[in-house]
């Protein structure tokens, strides 16, 4: 939830920032894209660090970095400064979700991971839905800068809570029962590390065609997801000319529905795995989700009525986010002990697609208007549904063994 707050705050203030700092639509696309490309570049290294040092330590660093640059966003005084701040922001925030997956892989059995990921993603969407109700009144009463100062303080409070509350391993938690601990350790499907562990080549995993299909699917998903995170508010305000007093609800409705989609997707996928096995249980639910989402976004781009478009986009985002927890659960299933690296790779691929799409959106909107870029986003999301037919969650990625690694 924490790492989504700044994105929605920036999107909510986009019109005001562009007017106040004299930023064009094309330049705004570069600002949004700069965060995304930095995030993509550092996602895999930060996921690897989490595999090596543990998710708790890396998440502490990520959120403290997030808090600092959320506050720094409020100090931006022009295009170049905001561009630099957003690049550094993305560089440090990278790895948040891969390291969350590392934490979940240690604490949850395999067949509960869909629901665990659904809780994480549902909370992020719920936070995104509530953020406009917090930041827009602050922006209207004070200024857009103040909203970023407030959000930065929220991240510091979360970090203090995380330091004292979370334990890296279930065995370190005093409140867990012996029976529950034994159940988690027996069903989480992680290797037991021995003194003389085998050193493996992480990069050898990229020979897996299964992984490449996962990356391709996530690009399609991320193109749609980042439209809502980056351009959606601007699309409503400048593309559909929705009044400022209506923007809070118009911006929040899709995220409220998306939270329902996240919770539903994870729950349905876990249930489907029990009924049809992990291969089809992890495949059918997100495939239907992206199929319906693509149709809804395409429909929203083509209708003239604002209310109909907002409803269609809300339903589309709900079905699209059915995919999110399942995709991350599949990355955990396929990656095993390297789930941080694999989920980081998946997110990096998605972010690369989101970067190109975000920048391209600005150029298309300034040249052709807002309906055409929304249309192409819907088509890409629709294509992602069919890629799920080539993804098999039962096929773990095989990593090449290099040499024994002796722990001293």
Give residue spans per PLM region.
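Structural signature of the two symmetry-related core transmembrane helices
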Residues: 57-72, 280-298
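Cytoplasmic helix-loop-helix junction between adjacent transmembrane helices
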Residues: 85-124
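Helix-loop-helix hairpin linking two adjacent transmembrane segments in secondary transporters
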Residues: 120, 124-173
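A membrane-interface helix-boundary motif in multi-pass transporters
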Residues: 140-153, 243, 281-284, 363-380
